[in-house]
Amino acid sequence: MSRSRLAKADAFEGRGNEIVTFSIDRNINYTNVCNVYCKFCAFWRREQAADAYVITHAEIDQKIEETLALGGTQILMQGGHHPSLSKQWYLDLLSHIREKFPTINVHGFSPSEFVHFRDVFDEPLEDLVRDFAAAGLGSIPGGGGEILVDRVRQKISPLKAMSDDWLEVMAIAHRHNLATTATMMFGHVETVEERIEHLDRVRVQQDATGGFTAFIAWTFQAENTKLKAPTVGSHEYLRMQALSRIYLDNIENIQSSWVTQGREIGQIALRHGANDLGSIMIEENVVSKAGTVYCMDVADMQRLITDLGYEPRQRDNWYHLVDAPAAAA
Protein backbone atom coordinates (compact mmCIF):
# COMPACT_ATOMS: atom_id res chain seq x y z
CA MET A 1 0.00 0.00 0.00
CA SER A 2 1.30 3.47 -0.85
CA ARG A 3 2.04 6.03 1.88
CA SER A 4 -0.76 8.27 0.62
CA ARG A 5 -3.36 5.47 0.56
CA LEU A 6 -2.39 4.20 4.00
CA ALA A 7 -2.42 7.73 5.41
CA LYS A 8 -5.81 8.48 3.91
CA ALA A 9 -7.27 5.26 5.29
CA ASP A 10 -6.06 6.17 8.78
CA ALA A 11 -7.31 9.75 8.70
CA PHE A 12 -9.90 11.00 11.19
CA GLU A 13 -10.80 7.46 12.34
CA GLY A 14 -12.80 6.79 9.19
CA ARG A 15 -14.53 10.14 9.15
CA GLY A 16 -11.83 11.40 6.79
CA ASN A 17 -13.77 9.71 4.02
CA GLU A 18 -16.80 11.90 4.77
CA ILE A 19 -15.89 15.21 6.40
CA VAL A 20 -13.04 17.67 5.97
CA THR A 21 -13.00 20.54 8.42
CA PHE A 22 -11.81 24.14 8.22
CA SER A 23 -11.88 27.16 10.50
CA ILE A 24 -12.33 30.89 10.26
CA ASP A 25 -9.82 32.78 12.33
CA ARG A 26 -7.35 35.61 12.14
CA ASN A 27 -3.61 35.50 12.71
CA ILE A 28 -2.78 38.56 14.81
CA ASN A 29 0.87 39.31 15.48
CA TYR A 30 0.88 41.63 18.47
CA THR A 31 4.46 42.78 17.89
CA ASN A 32 7.24 42.26 15.37
CA VAL A 33 9.93 43.24 17.88
CA CYS A 34 12.07 40.22 18.66
CA ASN A 35 15.46 39.59 20.20
CA VAL A 36 16.12 35.99 19.17
CA TYR A 37 16.90 36.77 15.50
CA CYS A 38 15.97 33.39 14.01
CA LYS A 39 17.77 32.82 10.73
CA PHE A 40 14.63 31.41 9.09
CA CYS A 41 12.42 34.41 9.94
CA ALA A 42 11.87 37.54 7.84
CA PHE A 43 9.29 39.05 10.19
CA TRP A 44 11.32 40.20 13.21
CA ARG A 45 12.53 43.75 13.81
CA ARG A 46 14.78 45.32 16.41
CA GLU A 47 13.03 47.51 18.96
CA GLN A 48 14.52 50.68 17.44
CA ALA A 49 13.54 49.86 13.84
CA ALA A 50 11.38 52.38 12.01
CA ASP A 51 8.76 49.73 11.21
CA ALA A 52 8.75 48.08 14.64
CA TYR A 53 5.31 48.00 16.26
CA VAL A 54 3.29 46.88 19.27
CA ILE A 55 -0.44 46.45 18.76
CA THR A 56 -2.91 48.70 20.58
CA HIS A 57 -6.22 47.64 22.11
CA ALA A 58 -8.05 49.71 19.49
CA GLU A 59 -6.22 47.92 16.68
CA ILE A 60 -6.94 44.48 18.06
CA ASP A 61 -10.60 45.40 18.62
CA GLN A 62 -10.96 46.29 14.96
CA LYS A 63 -9.30 43.06 13.85
CA ILE A 64 -11.55 40.94 16.09
CA GLU A 65 -14.70 42.77 14.99
CA GLU A 66 -13.79 42.05 11.36
CA THR A 67 -13.17 38.40 12.24
CA LEU A 68 -16.55 38.06 13.94
CA ALA A 69 -18.27 39.67 10.96
CA LEU A 70 -16.86 36.90 8.76
CA GLY A 71 -18.09 34.16 11.10
CA GLY A 72 -14.77 33.67 12.86
CA THR A 73 -14.49 31.86 16.17
CA GLN A 74 -10.94 32.59 17.29
CA ILE A 75 -7.77 34.59 16.88
CA LEU A 76 -4.31 33.08 16.58
CA MET A 77 -2.23 35.57 18.55
CA GLN A 78 1.56 35.34 18.51
CA GLY A 79 4.42 37.78 18.38
CA GLY A 80 8.10 38.38 18.61
CA HIS A 81 10.10 37.97 21.80
CA HIS A 82 9.82 41.60 22.87
CA PRO A 83 12.43 42.47 25.50
CA SER A 84 10.52 45.34 27.13
CA LEU A 85 6.82 44.43 27.42
CA SER A 86 5.74 43.62 30.97
CA LYS A 87 3.79 40.59 32.12
CA GLN A 88 0.93 42.90 33.00
CA TRP A 89 0.80 44.16 29.41
CA TYR A 90 0.01 40.63 28.22
CA LEU A 91 -2.49 39.93 31.00
CA ASP A 92 -4.26 43.23 30.36
CA LEU A 93 -4.51 42.41 26.66
CA LEU A 94 -6.03 39.01 27.38
CA SER A 95 -8.46 40.42 29.94
CA HIS A 96 -9.50 43.16 27.53
CA ILE A 97 -10.26 40.64 24.77
CA ARG A 98 -12.20 38.34 27.10
CA GLU A 99 -14.30 41.20 28.45
CA LYS A 100 -15.09 42.78 25.09
CA PHE A 101 -15.29 39.62 22.94
CA PRO A 102 -16.35 36.73 25.20
CA THR A 103 -17.17 34.39 22.29
CA ILE A 104 -13.70 34.60 20.72
CA ASN A 105 -11.11 31.99 21.65
CA VAL A 106 -7.57 33.28 22.05
CA HIS A 107 -5.28 30.62 20.62
CA GLY A 108 -2.10 32.35 21.59
CA PHE A 109 1.50 32.53 22.79
CA SER A 110 3.66 29.69 21.52
CA PRO A 111 5.91 27.66 23.84
CA SER A 112 8.93 29.70 22.76
CA GLU A 113 7.11 32.86 23.87
CA PHE A 114 6.40 31.31 27.26
CA VAL A 115 10.06 30.38 27.64
CA HIS A 116 10.89 34.01 26.81
CA PHE A 117 8.39 35.13 29.48
CA ARG A 118 10.01 32.78 31.99
CA ASP A 119 13.42 34.29 31.37
CA VAL A 120 12.34 37.95 31.23
CA PHE A 121 9.81 37.89 34.09
CA ASP A 122 11.81 35.40 36.19
CA GLU A 123 8.75 33.29 36.95
CA PRO A 124 8.15 29.53 36.67
CA LEU A 125 6.48 28.30 33.50
CA GLU A 126 3.74 26.68 35.56
CA ASP A 127 2.76 30.01 37.12
CA LEU A 128 2.88 31.83 33.79
CA VAL A 129 0.63 29.35 32.00
CA ARG A 130 -1.81 29.41 34.92
CA ASP A 131 -1.92 33.22 35.03
CA PHE A 132 -2.33 33.60 31.27
CA ALA A 133 -5.15 31.05 31.26
CA ALA A 134 -6.86 32.86 34.13
CA ALA A 135 -6.66 36.12 32.17
CA GLY A 136 -8.33 34.64 29.09
CA LEU A 137 -5.93 32.43 27.15
CA GLY A 138 -7.94 29.55 25.71
CA SER A 139 -5.38 27.37 23.95
CA ILE A 140 -1.74 27.37 22.84
CA PRO A 141 -0.42 27.05 19.27
CA GLY A 142 2.53 24.89 18.31
CA GLY A 143 4.63 27.74 16.96
CA GLY A 144 8.35 27.49 17.51
CA GLY A 145 8.32 23.72 17.14
CA GLU A 146 10.46 23.80 14.00
CA ILE A 147 12.45 20.56 14.47
CA LEU A 148 12.60 19.23 18.04
CA VAL A 149 16.28 18.35 17.84
CA ASP A 150 18.71 20.67 19.58
CA ARG A 151 21.44 20.27 16.96
CA VAL A 152 19.06 21.81 14.43
CA ARG A 153 17.77 24.47 16.80
CA GLN A 154 21.29 25.57 17.68
CA LYS A 155 21.91 26.22 14.00
CA ILE A 156 18.70 28.02 13.02
CA SER A 157 17.56 29.70 16.26
CA PRO A 158 20.22 29.41 18.98
CA LEU A 159 18.64 32.07 21.21
CA LYS A 160 15.18 30.52 21.21
CA ALA A 161 13.68 27.73 23.31
CA MET A 162 15.31 24.34 22.95
CA SER A 163 13.40 21.10 22.45
CA ASP A 164 12.87 20.16 26.10
CA ASP A 165 11.64 23.69 26.88
CA TRP A 166 9.06 23.52 24.08
CA LEU A 167 7.79 20.16 25.26
CA GLU A 168 7.70 21.27 28.90
CA VAL A 169 5.40 24.18 28.08
CA MET A 170 3.08 21.81 26.23
CA ALA A 171 3.03 19.36 29.14
CA ILE A 172 2.16 22.18 31.54
CA ALA A 173 -0.56 23.46 29.22
CA HIS A 174 -2.11 20.00 29.05
CA ARG A 175 -2.07 19.74 32.85
CA HIS A 176 -4.04 22.98 32.94
CA ASN A 177 -6.54 21.59 30.41
CA LEU A 178 -5.37 23.91 27.65
CA ALA A 179 -5.54 22.28 24.24
CA THR A 180 -2.51 22.80 22.03
CA THR A 181 -1.32 21.98 18.53
CA ALA A 182 1.99 20.51 17.44
CA THR A 183 3.91 21.70 14.39
CA MET A 184 6.95 20.94 12.29
CA MET A 185 8.85 23.23 9.92
CA PHE A 186 11.12 21.14 7.73
CA GLY A 187 13.33 21.50 4.68
CA HIS A 188 16.30 23.46 6.02
CA VAL A 189 19.28 22.02 7.91
CA GLU A 190 17.67 18.92 9.40
CA THR A 191 18.23 15.35 8.23
CA VAL A 192 15.45 12.89 7.45
CA GLU A 193 16.37 11.05 10.65
CA GLU A 194 15.86 14.27 12.61
CA ARG A 195 12.42 14.70 11.08
CA ILE A 196 11.55 11.26 12.43
CA GLU A 197 12.99 12.18 15.82
CA HIS A 198 10.73 15.24 15.83
CA LEU A 199 7.66 13.13 15.08
CA ASP A 200 8.65 10.67 17.78
CA ARG A 201 9.02 13.35 20.44
CA VAL A 202 5.58 14.69 19.57
CA ARG A 203 4.13 11.18 19.67
CA VAL A 204 5.69 10.40 23.06
CA GLN A 205 4.38 13.69 24.47
CA GLN A 206 0.89 12.92 23.19
CA ASP A 207 0.99 9.48 24.79
CA ALA A 208 1.94 11.10 28.09
CA THR A 209 -0.44 14.07 28.22
CA GLY A 210 -2.91 13.74 25.35
CA GLY A 211 -3.50 17.45 24.77
CA PHE A 212 -2.52 17.91 21.12
CA THR A 213 -5.64 18.46 19.02
CA ALA A 214 -3.81 18.57 15.69
CA PHE A 215 -0.47 18.34 13.93
CA ILE A 216 0.60 20.73 11.18
CA ALA A 217 3.75 20.40 9.07
CA TRP A 218 5.02 22.93 6.55
CA THR A 219 8.12 23.60 4.52
CA PHE A 220 10.69 26.30 5.22
CA GLN A 221 10.10 29.47 3.17
CA ALA A 222 13.51 30.95 2.43
CA GLU A 223 12.88 34.27 0.68
CA ASN A 224 14.07 37.35 2.63
CA THR A 225 15.61 35.21 5.39
CA LYS A 226 19.24 34.67 6.39
CA LEU A 227 18.90 30.90 6.23
CA LYS A 228 19.40 29.53 2.76
CA ALA A 229 18.49 25.98 1.85
CA PRO A 230 17.37 24.10 -1.27
CA THR A 231 13.65 24.45 -1.86
CA VAL A 232 11.63 21.46 -0.70
CA GLY A 233 9.18 20.53 -3.43
CA SER A 234 5.55 19.49 -3.26
CA HIS A 235 6.36 15.79 -3.56
CA GLU A 236 8.53 15.90 -0.43
CA TYR A 237 5.87 17.89 1.43
CA LEU A 238 3.19 15.33 0.58
CA ARG A 239 5.45 12.45 1.62
CA MET A 240 5.96 14.10 5.02
CA GLN A 241 2.23 14.79 5.29
CA ALA A 242 1.45 11.12 4.72
CA LEU A 243 4.19 9.97 7.07
CA SER A 244 2.90 12.32 9.78
CA ARG A 245 -0.55 10.75 9.57
CA ILE A 246 0.85 7.23 9.79
CA TYR A 247 3.32 7.94 12.61
CA LEU A 248 1.08 10.20 14.70
CA ASP A 249 -1.90 7.89 14.93
CA ASN A 250 -2.47 9.16 18.47
CA ILE A 251 -3.26 12.69 17.24
CA GLU A 252 -6.72 12.77 15.73
CA ASN A 253 -6.35 15.66 13.31
CA ILE A 254 -3.74 16.38 10.63
CA GLN A 255 -3.90 19.79 8.99
CA SER A 256 -2.93 20.66 5.44
CA SER A 257 -0.65 23.70 5.04
CA TRP A 258 -2.18 25.43 2.01
CA VAL A 259 -0.76 28.71 3.39
CA THR A 260 2.75 27.60 2.43
CA GLN A 261 1.94 25.12 -0.34
CA GLY A 262 -0.85 26.85 -2.24
CA ARG A 263 -4.38 25.71 -3.04
CA GLU A 264 -3.63 22.78 -5.32
CA ILE A 265 -1.11 21.05 -3.06
CA GLY A 266 -3.17 21.97 -0.02
CA GLN A 267 -6.06 20.11 -1.62
CA ILE A 268 -3.94 17.12 -2.66
CA ALA A 269 -2.77 16.86 0.96
CA LEU A 270 -6.32 15.78 1.79
CA ARG A 271 -5.47 12.60 -0.11
CA HIS A 272 -2.25 12.23 1.87
CA GLY A 273 -3.59 11.98 5.40
CA ALA A 274 -4.93 15.45 6.18
CA ASN A 275 -8.52 15.73 7.37
CA ASP A 276 -8.46 19.48 7.95
CA LEU A 277 -7.73 22.37 5.60
CA GLY A 278 -6.85 24.86 8.32
CA SER A 279 -8.10 28.41 8.38
CA ILE A 280 -9.05 30.85 5.64
CA MET A 281 -6.42 33.10 7.29
CA ILE A 282 -8.03 36.52 7.28
CA GLU A 283 -4.60 37.89 8.10
CA GLU A 284 -1.13 36.35 7.95
CA ASN A 285 2.16 38.20 8.37
CA VAL A 286 5.04 35.85 9.10
CA VAL A 287 4.99 33.49 6.11
CA SER A 288 4.11 36.36 3.77
CA LYS A 289 7.23 38.24 4.87
CA ALA A 290 9.20 35.25 3.59
CA GLY A 291 7.69 35.69 0.15
CA THR A 292 4.77 33.23 0.18
CA VAL A 293 1.29 34.71 -0.14
CA TYR A 294 -1.80 32.59 -0.81
CA CYS A 295 -5.38 33.64 -0.06
CA MET A 296 -8.70 31.81 0.22
CA ASP A 297 -12.19 32.67 1.36
CA VAL A 298 -14.82 30.28 2.72
CA ALA A 299 -16.27 29.55 -0.73
CA ASP A 300 -12.81 28.69 -2.07
CA MET A 301 -12.15 26.35 0.83
CA GLN A 302 -15.51 24.64 0.54
CA ARG A 303 -14.98 24.15 -3.18
CA LEU A 304 -11.57 22.51 -2.68
CA ILE A 305 -13.15 20.08 -0.23
CA THR A 306 -16.29 19.25 -2.21
CA ASP A 307 -14.31 18.76 -5.43
CA LEU A 308 -12.70 15.74 -3.75
CA GLY A 309 -16.06 14.36 -2.66
CA TYR A 310 -15.85 15.36 1.00
CA GLU A 311 -18.32 17.35 3.07
CA PRO A 312 -16.87 20.72 4.21
CA ARG A 313 -17.67 21.64 7.80
CA GLN A 314 -16.56 24.62 9.84
CA ARG A 315 -14.97 23.81 13.21
CA ASP A 316 -13.71 25.60 16.27
CA ASN A 317 -10.26 25.20 17.84
CA TRP A 318 -11.30 21.98 19.61
CA TYR A 319 -12.59 20.45 16.37
CA HIS A 320 -16.21 20.77 17.38
CA LEU A 321 -18.37 21.35 14.31
CA VAL A 322 -19.95 24.80 14.54
CA ASP A 323 -22.04 24.91 11.35
CA ALA A 324 -25.07 22.97 10.21
CA PRO A 325 -24.51 20.13 7.76
CA ALA A 326 -25.45 20.86 4.16
CA ALA A 327 -29.00 19.87 3.27
CA ALA A 328 -29.31 16.67 1.30
CA ALA A 329 -29.93 17.20 -2.40
Residue spans of the language-model regions?
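N-terminal cationic-hydrophobic initiation segments that often serve targeting/anchoring roles
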Residues: K8, F12, L68, R98, ...
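An N-cap/entry alpha-helix motif that binds or orients negatively charged groups
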Residues: M1-T21
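Canonical Radical SAM [4Fe-4S] cluster-binding loop centered on the CxxxCxxC motif
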Residues: V20-E59
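Hydrophobic faces of well-ordered beta-strands that scaffold small-molecule active sites
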Residues: E18-I28, I75, V106-S110, I140-G142, ...
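Glycine-rich, proline-tolerant flexible connector loops at the mouths of alpha/beta enzymes
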Residues: F22-I28, Q48-D51, Q78-Q88, D150, ...
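Helix C-cap/helix->beta junction micro-motif
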Residues: A11, K100-I104, H176, T209, ...
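Conserved Radical SAM active-site core
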Residues: R45-E197, R201-V204
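Auxiliary Fe-S-binding modules of radical SAM enzymes
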Residues: M1-S2, L68, D200, Q206-A329
